[in-house]
């Protein structure tokens, strides 16, 4: 057996071992300590005494503290992250399992104060602090609740925000309008973290935006008081109508956390079923890592299962293999049949996409849809059930293409020219869902390699032109949901190659860039600093996932194995058992500078895909 085949065999065996009885893979979707701290704060605020969970979460948070008292979002983040440290500090104190006078807490407090105190917190953290009585709400939030009433024709309306922006914004608007806060007799005192006064100031230019919107609503629709009440009801109903079967609001941690506080502000009791179900849903996001509980931001079972199932088949596992069949059955049961918010921007499309998690029934996305379609592709020909799922998935996917030719994540044509004017740091990430290189590239790769759509089709040509028009000067592409330029370049190159452009100057330039940044050990590695600095930052170490992405891109674009490919393949084969900080380094991001993801599955998926493509194209 060749070394490449042996490497693939080892990865396949590891994946087979980790498959769940229902056919899914449930590798952790690890997102730092923020959700763990918020879960403690939520349980303590609601006076739900799940001590075993709270103690476990506190232990996990403490295990991640740096020697200087701070918490980091990723290994090479300089010094630490003030916002994460504040969240950890608050969660630990509220847990009751560590005292303020503990040396570790003193070090954390010192770090927070040296980096701006409570005032330095990001907007979501400030909302959490205000909701739990630790910070004062601003006199007026930059976006008035009346935005809920503005018609789609208005230049600034609720549905111009991304879906993940809306689901967080609806409860925030209620909370800020009510200026709600809830403390308990055990609430920690964080006043010593204030460097000035606990006042959330909104700049004058944003207050004028607030007034403009409020006046616009009144002019369009009528009397202020009646509108106010109607807007509050609409925000409340927006939440309640989008609760998933597990009790979560759109299956996200943050939106569910905020919904609980918003409902409390509207007079719901802590014992209401909707509150209890929401908390139970958040608890179900638990995933144990190294013996300690972690509350995931979301469950990634559809993403994991579809990617792994595709990788197995690329590596030679038959579509009739029990592992593949079970996984496909799992995916088929979770194809969407309901209309969600996406239908507002695509009124002629019908349901047929897939979402990120197994409980997601309303919010499909382009990435999970192409991933699931790849997984079932080899089962379609002789099975009418799979053929129907395939046809519905394709039509939904095609309907999501933006007018600019690119693909967004969740909804088409939600470009919002107002986003730069909102006083929310990284608002373009939180509230925007523009086309991205990773979504567009992967969709092109799927259409080119898995369907009969010709390269001359306008849908393909427009996507290709979008990628050509959005390439960076150095030859790379920026990836929205991964780290970052290697990720975007991999998706773009493989997509363009599948569309017949492997010899295009843009693709050659991208491959030259990848070759230039290869490390001496044959691998590749990119820092999470890239996304906040808007340019490639090397990690100064190689990772399995980065290396797999880079190799896979070059393989797609060349006819013969190059020296760079050979060195990269050798790095992968020598590093499959690697266990160090690079293994746990985040490869995904959702909010630049604030929110990073360690997908535990990636170390298996992408090396297996790269090895399979290498073996299939070049042999040994």
Language-model segments: residues:
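Preference for long, amphipathic alpha-helical scaffolds in soluble/luminal domains
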Residues: 1-620
């Amino acid at each position: 057996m060749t070394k490449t085949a042996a490497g693939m065999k080892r990865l396949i065996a590891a994946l087979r071992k980790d498959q769940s009885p229902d056919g899914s893979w449930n590798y952790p979707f690890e997102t730092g300590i923020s959700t763990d701290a918020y879960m403690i704060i939520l349980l303590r605020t609601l006076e739900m005494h799940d001590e075993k969970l709270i103690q476990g979460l506190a232990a996990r948070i403490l295990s991640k503290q740096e020697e200087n008292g701070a918490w980091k979002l990723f290994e090479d983040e300089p010094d630490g992250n003030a916002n994460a440290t504040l969240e950890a500090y608050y969660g630990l104190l509220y847990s009751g399992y560590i005292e303020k006078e503990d040396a570790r807490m003193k070090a954390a407090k010192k770090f927070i104060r040296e980096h701006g105190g409570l005032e330095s917190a990001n907007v979501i953290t400030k909302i959490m602090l205000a909701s739990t009585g630790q910070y004062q709400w601003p006199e007026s939030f930059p976006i008035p609740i009346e935005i809920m009433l503005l018609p789609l024709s208005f230049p600034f309306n609720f549905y111009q925000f991304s879906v993940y922006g809306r689901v967080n914004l609806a409860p925030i608007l209620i909370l800020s309008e009510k200026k709600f806060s809830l403390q308990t007799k055990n609430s920690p005192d964080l006043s010593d973290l204030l460097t000035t006064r606990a006042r959330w100031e909104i700049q004058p230019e944003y207050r004028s935006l607030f007034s403009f919107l409020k006046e616009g609503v009144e002019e369009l629709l009528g009397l202020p008081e009646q509108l106010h009440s109607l807007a509050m009801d609409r925000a409340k109903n927006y939440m309640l109508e989008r609760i998933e079967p597990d009790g979560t609001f759109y299956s996200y941690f943050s939106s569910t956390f905020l919904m609980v506080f918003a409902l409390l502000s509207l007079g719901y009791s802590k014992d209401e079923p909707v509150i209890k179900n929401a908390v139970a849903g958040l608890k179900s996001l638990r995933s144990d890592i190294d013996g300690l509980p972690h509350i995931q931001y979301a469950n990634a079972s559809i993403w994991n299962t579809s990617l792994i199932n595709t990788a197995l088949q690329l590596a030679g596992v038959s579509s009739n293999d029990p592992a593949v069949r079970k996984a496909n059955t799992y995916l088929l049961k979770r194809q969407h049949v309901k209309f969600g918010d996406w239908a507002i921007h695509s009124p002629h499309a019908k349901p047929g996409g897939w979402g990120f998690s197994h409980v997601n029934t309303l919010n499909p996305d382009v990435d999970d849809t192409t991933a699931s379609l790849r997984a079932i592709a080899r089962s379609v020909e002789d099975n009418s059930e799979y053929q129907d799922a395939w046809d519905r998935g394709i039509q939904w996917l095609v309907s999501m293409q933006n007018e600019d030719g690119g693909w967004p994540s969740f909804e088409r044509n939600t470009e919002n020219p107002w986003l730069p004017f909102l006083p929310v740091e990284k608002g373009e990430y939180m509230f925007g869902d523009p086309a991205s290189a990773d979504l567009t590239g992967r969709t092109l790769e799927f259409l080119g390699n898995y369907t009969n759509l010709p390269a001359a089709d306008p849908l393909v040509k427009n996507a290709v032109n979008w990628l050509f028009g959005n390439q960076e000067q150095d030859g790379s592409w920026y990836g929205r949901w991964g780290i970052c330029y290697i990720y975007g370049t991999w998706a773009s190159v493989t997509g363009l190659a599948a569309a017949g452009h492997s010899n295009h100057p843009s693709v050659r330039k991208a491959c030259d860039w990848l070759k230039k940044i290869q490390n001496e050990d044959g691998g590749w590695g990119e820092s999470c600093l890239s996304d906040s600095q808007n340019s490639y930052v090397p990690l100064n170490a190689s990772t399995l996932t980065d290396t797999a992405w880079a190799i896979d891109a070059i393989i797609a674009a060349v006819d013969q194995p190059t020296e760079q490919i050979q060195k990269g393949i050798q790095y992968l084969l020598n590093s499959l058992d690697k266990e160090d900080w690079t293994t746990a380094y985040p490869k995904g991001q959702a909010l630049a500078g604030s929110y990073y993801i360690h997908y535990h599955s990636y170390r298996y998926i992408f090396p297996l895909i790269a090895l399979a493509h290498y073996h299939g194209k070049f042999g040994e």
